[in-house]
């Protein structure tokens, strides 16, 4: 497929330890404000909100068309006391993650799938309308099943490459032979090009006003539309999951939603774990300090003021990636006050995305092999003159250059053959040439 009406010379420069290389071109009730209130705003907490390689000026919402955080009015009077977007047909079934794929379970398999189905007017009832955690996870797990990832790894993969459907790509699941394997076949990469993230954003949630903005996003994205049913978004969370028994409570008999489990805080130890916030319930509560009351207006932590940290009523609805039977139905409540935990910075922020459809103007099909993909370097260039010795425009595809966006190549793509561990056969991929 030509880039324009005039002929172009397309050249591919490959540098690395190549075993062989071949290429073929182709075609509640309203909440009151804290005494000192911080409003919802964009934030870039390190190291989990954006790639360090992009620098301090990188705006992760750039490319999105919807209003950024802080650009909409948060009118809490319109909010219902409960929202659960996991009951919408656009939300995929819960399943149990394998390996360290939780970040991609949240960012891609859950949030990206939900948002893309809303955009397309489809439902997540088949593999043709669901998106796998494993395509993006295998891009950054160094071919190591124990290696985790940030949500932004999936969202940046979706921005630069795209995400194929489960029907086309499949799932890695418990198959260790597929850990670190890259998709082999131009059609898989070509399909992925169409499904993209336009922008993503992290915001702090440490005050009542910030919680209210998050509630509004979950209800109708803080964009009420007259005559239309509200359609809310989802939010990414990074929780600390060690010693969960110490922070898990069961709502007692006689209280609202008795028998349901609720986290009153993040776990006191352990590493981060990606989970998905699908809604909220302002009536869910638990008597955290044991005074016989479930209150929102008492200074229970003794710091001399009443803030979000003192609230015992109001909770997010969280979907975990530990299977449909975990905590009865794969979901649990998380008190709003847990978001203030000063010992777990990651747990003080929520992530969101905007998705888009993209039709590439021109593509390139490559078939190549490399015995160590962390050393591979590929540059694609074009020139208007067929006899040109220098490209007029160049493109260095992230996957074929060790994903420099994510840092050190060996920590991302792994020191394995291009196709995957133990497989030195040629890999066929597709590259979107639209940026050229």
What are the functions of these language-model segments?
Residues 11-20:
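Bacterial N-terminal signal peptides
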Residues 62-163:
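Substrate-binding/charge-relay-adjacent region of secreted/lumenal peptidase catalytic domains
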């Amino acid at each position: 497929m030509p880039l324009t009406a005039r002929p172009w010379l397309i050249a591919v420069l490959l540098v690395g330890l190549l075993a062989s290389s071949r290429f073929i071109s182709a075609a509640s009730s309203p909440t009151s404000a804290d005494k000192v209130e911080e409003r919802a705003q964009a934030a870039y907490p390190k190291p989990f909100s954006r790639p360090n390689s992009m620098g301090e000026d990188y705006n992760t919402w750039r490319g999105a068309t919807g209003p950024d955080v802080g650009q909409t009015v948060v009118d809490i009077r319109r909010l219902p006391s409960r929202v659960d977007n996991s009951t919408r047909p656009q939300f995929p079934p819960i399943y149990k993650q394998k390996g360290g794929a939780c970040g991609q379970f949240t960012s891609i398999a859950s949030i990206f799938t939900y948002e893309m189905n809303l955009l397309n007017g489809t439902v997540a009832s088949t593999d043709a309308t669901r998106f796998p955690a494993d395509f993006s996870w295998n891009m950054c797990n160094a071919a190591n099943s124990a290696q985790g990832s940030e949500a932004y790894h999936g969202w940046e993969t979706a921005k630069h490459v795209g995400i194929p459907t489960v029907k086309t790509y499949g799932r890695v699941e418990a198959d260790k032979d597929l850990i670190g394997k890259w998709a082999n076949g131009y059609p898989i990469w070509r399909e992925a090009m169409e499904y993209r993230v336009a922008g993503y954003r992290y915001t702090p949630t440490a005050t009542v006003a910030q919680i209210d903005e998050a509630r509004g996003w979950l209800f109708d994205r803080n964009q009420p539309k007259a005559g239309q049913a509200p359609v809310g978004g989802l939010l990414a969370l990074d929780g600390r999951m060690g010693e969960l028994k110490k922070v898990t409570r069961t709502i007692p008999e006689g209280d609202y939603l008795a028998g349901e489990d609720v986290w009153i805080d993040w776990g006191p130890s352990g590493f981060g774990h990606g989970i998905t916030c699908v809604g909220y319930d302002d009536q869910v509560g638990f008597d955290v300090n044991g005074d016989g009351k479930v209150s929102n207006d008492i200074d229970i932590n003794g710091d001399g003021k009443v803030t979000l940290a003192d609230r015992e009523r109001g909770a997010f609805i969280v979907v975990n990636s530990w299977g449909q039977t975990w905590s009865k139905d794969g979901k649990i409540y998380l008190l709003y006050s847990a978001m203030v935990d000063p010992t777990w910075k990651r747990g003080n922020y929520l992530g969101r995305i905007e998705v888009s459809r993209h039709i590439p103007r021109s593509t390139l099909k490559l078939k190549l092999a490399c015995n160590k993909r962390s050393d591979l370097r590929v540059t694609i260039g074009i020139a208007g003159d067929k006899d040109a010795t220098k490209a007029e425009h160049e493109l260095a595809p992230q996957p074929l250059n060790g994903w420099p966006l994510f840092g050190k190549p060996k920590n991302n793509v792994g020191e394995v053959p291009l196709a995957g561990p133990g497989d030195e056969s040629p890999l066929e991929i597709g590259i979107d040439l639209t940026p050229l």
